[in-house]
């Protein structure tokens, strides 16, 4: 166990920092209806209804006044699947959306760490680059 912590200490540091950066998402009064938040939540809800009704979730029949709309033309289904998995964990679509944002922050930090580590051959530099990347205004603004 000690060996595992020693081997993965930099990824654990990134994980802890990603959770600290994501703390504002845990507020209940956080407005997630900005940027693309409302579209992702509405899409996840419509996909959930399609699955519940036994329909093909590629065409969301509850949208466009019942005519259906294929939202997956513009966005892939992976983000919707993550929101629905988050909904299973948190029981709400907003909680599922926040769960997806936290997972995205964590995965982006780990991915940029791996890239920076291969590029610079230095694990501490990789952690620094990962933390700076996670703290970029784009990430913080879109959360």
Regions found by a protein language model. Give the residues of each.
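Short hydrophobic/aromatic helix or loop-helix immediately within or flanking a transmembrane segment
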Residues: 45, 63-91
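Start-transfer (signal-anchor) and selected internal transmembrane alpha helices
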Residues: 1-25
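Membrane-embedded helix bundles of polyisoprenyl
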Residues: 14-20, 100-119, 123-143
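Membrane-water interface at transmembrane helix exits
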Residues: 48, 83, 87, 113-120
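Loop-to-helix entry region of an early transmembrane alpha helix in multi-pass inner-membrane enzymes
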Residues: 77, 81, 88-110
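Extracytoplasmic loop-helix module adjacent to an early transmembrane segment
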Residues: 25-59
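Conserved short loop/turn motifs at secondary-structure junctions
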Residues: 32, 65-71, 87, 99-106
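Membrane-helix boundary/interfacial segments in multi-pass membrane proteins
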Residues: 32-33, 38, 65-67, 89, ...
């Amino acid at each position: 166990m000690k060996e595992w912590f020693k081997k993965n200490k930099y990824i654990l540091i990134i994980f802890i920092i990603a959770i600290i950066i994501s703390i504002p998402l845990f507020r209940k009064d956080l407005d997630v209806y900005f940027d693309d938040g409302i579209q992702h939540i509405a899409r996840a809800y419509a996909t959930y209804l399609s699955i519940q009704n036994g329909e093909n979730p590629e065409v969301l029949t509850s949208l466009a006044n019942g005519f259906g709309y294929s939202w997956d033309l513009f966005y892939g289904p992976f983000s919707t699947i993550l929101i629905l998995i988050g909904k299973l964990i948190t029981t709400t679509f907003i909680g599922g959306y926040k769960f997806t944002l936290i997972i995205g922050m964590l995965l982006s930090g780990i991915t940029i760490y791996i890239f920076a580590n291969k590029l610079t051959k230095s694990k501490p530099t990789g952690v620094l680059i990962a933390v700076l990347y996670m703290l970029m205004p784009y990430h913080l603004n879109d959360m």
